[in-house]
């Protein structure tokens, strides 16, 4: 009986070990990228290049679909022709206000605002794509791309994607000359955008687990605290 007990104990430990190993493997791969979109960027009328972003449609399907549809313009409105209205070096670049262009506007495909879907993903690296907001459950169309690790935004802003290609363009945007309220002095514009074919299954590197704006008018992540 003692021998049988030892065998059963070993089997249990082996099963637990296999379960933990499989869980770590899945986590290492990160959230699944289900669609890819692109922005073609100009600065002061001169081409900068293309940014390609992967969206985490399984972890945050509603938020990812909002961004995808605004990139394609299939609802009759979206990001094409809009600008990055706020850039802070070593923090983030922010855009998506295609109605007012100054951080006070924008809208989602679900109406003016929609709720925070979840905070399973964190701001663990450069190139994270996340929703700007004016507080709890105020997501519209404004978004930001991180240019540093911004852990203080975790649990406050919904991460829904990452930059796959063209991070050098993000780097160029974060250092453009700017004026009042961190607005570029010359337009950084999304001149063309849309969806790309998913020719290969891609996995992101996010980690499963971004604060109130400076004013009630401005939808934005917190000011630079790095």
From Swiss-Prot:
Q: Which UniProt keywords apply?
A: Endoplasmic reticulum, Glycoprotein, Isomerase, Rotamase, Signal
Q: Which domain of life is it from?
A: Eukaryota
Indicate the segments forming the PPIase cyclophilin-type domain, all copies. Answer: 38-195
From start to end residue, where is composition biased (Basic and acidic residues)? 211-226
The leader peptide range reads 1-28
**Which segment of this protein is annotated as the motif Prevents secretion from ER?**
223-226
**CDD domains found in the cross-reference section:** cyclophilin_ABH_like
Q: Which GO BP annotation is one of this protein's?
A: protein folding
Give EC number(s), comma-separated.
5.2.1.8
Instruction: State which residues carry a glycan (glycosylated).
Output: 139
Record-linked Pfam families: Pro_isomerase
Q: Which GO terms describe its molecular function?
A: cyclosporin A binding; peptidyl-prolyl cis-trans isomerase activity
Its gene is CPR2
Main location, first listed in the record: endoplasmic reticulum
Q: Tell me the compartments it is located in.
A: Endoplasmic reticulum lumen
Q: What is this protein called?
A: Peptidyl-prolyl cis-trans isomerase B
Regarding protein family, the annotation reads: Belongs to the cyclophilin-type PPIase family. PPIase B subfamily.
Activity control, as annotated, is: Inhibited by cyclosporin A (CsA).
Query: What organism is the protein native to?
Result: Arthroderma benhamiae (Trichophyton mentagrophytes)
- CC per GO annotation: endoplasmic reticulum lumen; fungal-type vacuole
InterPro entries (UniProt xref): Cyclophilin-like_dom_sf, Cyclophilin-type_PPIase_CS, Cyclophilin-type_PPIase_dom
User: What's the top EC group for this one?
Assistant: isomerase
Catalyses: [protein]-peptidylproline (omega=180) = [protein]-peptidylproline (omega=0)
Describe the function of this protein: PPIases accelerate the folding of proteins. It catalyzes the cis-trans isomerization of proline imidic peptide bonds in oligopeptides.
Q: Where is this region: Disordered?
A: 194-226
């Amino acid at each position: 009986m003692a021998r049988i007990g030892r065998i059963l104990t070993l089997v249990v430990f082996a099963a637990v070990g296999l379960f933990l190993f499989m869980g770590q493997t899945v986590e290492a791969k990160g959230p699944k990228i289900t669609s890819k979109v692109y922005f073609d960027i100009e600065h002061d009328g001169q081409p900068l290049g293309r940014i390609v972003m992967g969206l985490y449609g399984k972890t945050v399907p509603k938020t990812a679909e909002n961004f995808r549809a605004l990139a394609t313009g299939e609802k009759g409105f979206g990001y094409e022709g809009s600008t990055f209205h706020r850039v802070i070096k070593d923090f983030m670049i922010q855009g998506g206000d295609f109605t007012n262009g100054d951080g006070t506007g924008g809208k989602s495909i679900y109406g003016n605002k929609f709720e925070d879907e979840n905070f399973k993903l964190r701001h663990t690296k450069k190139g994270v794509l996340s929703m700007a907001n004016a507080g709890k459950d105020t997501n519209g169309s404004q978004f930001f791309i991180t240019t540093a690790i911004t852990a203080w935004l975790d649990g406050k802003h919904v991460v829904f994607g990452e930059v796959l290609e063209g991070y050098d363009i993000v780097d160029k945007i974060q250092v453009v000359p700017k004026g009042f309220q961190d607005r570029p002095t010359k337009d950084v514009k999304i001149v063309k955008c849309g969806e790309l074919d998913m020719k290969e299954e891609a996995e992101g590197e996010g980690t499963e687990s971004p604060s109130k704006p400076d004013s009630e008018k401005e939808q934005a992540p917190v000011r630079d605290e790095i």
